Amino acid sequence: MSNMKITNRFMLVATFIACVFISSMNMTVGKVIGYPGLKPDLPCDHHRYPSACAPSEQPVNPYRRGCSKIHRCRRDSPPAPISRKMLIRGQLIYNNAYNAYIQYP
């Protein structure tokens, strides 16, 4: 066998052994981190910042839409399509101006 096959086989066996070892470990033995400050029946305990205990009268971040109507947000409807008549008229005006420029430099 070539060295590459031996190396690949060794890596496969080592990976398998590592997976078996990790899966056999008991992961639930560790200490569970809780949130004691979020329990509703406990009184507020902020001695340094008593204002943190009282609910604020004004929201921390007031609502903003994110963009104004003039900038046409993604959720707004797209602009109305240009009619064929307007496209033809605009092309004729452009062609006439271009031809006038070419004829009279």
Swiss-Prot record:
It comes from Arabidopsis thaliana. InterPro entries: RALF. Belongs to the plant rapid alkalinization factor (RALF) family. It is found in: Secreted. Residues 1-30 form the signal peptide. One of its GO terms (molecular function) is hormone activity. Disulfide bonds join 44-53, 67-73. Cell signaling peptide that may regulate plant stress, growth, and development. Mediates a rapid alkalinization of extracellular space by mediating a transient increase in the cytoplasmic Ca(2+) concentration leading to a calcium-dependent signaling events through a cell surface receptor and a concomitant activation of some intracellular mitogen-activated protein kinases. This is Protein RALF-like 21. The gene is RALFL21. One of its GO terms (cellular component) is apoplast. GO terms for biological process: calcium-mediated signaling; cell-cell signaling; regulation of growth. Expressed in seeds and rosettes. It holds the Pfam family RALF. Keywords: Disulfide bond, Hormone, Secreted, Signal.
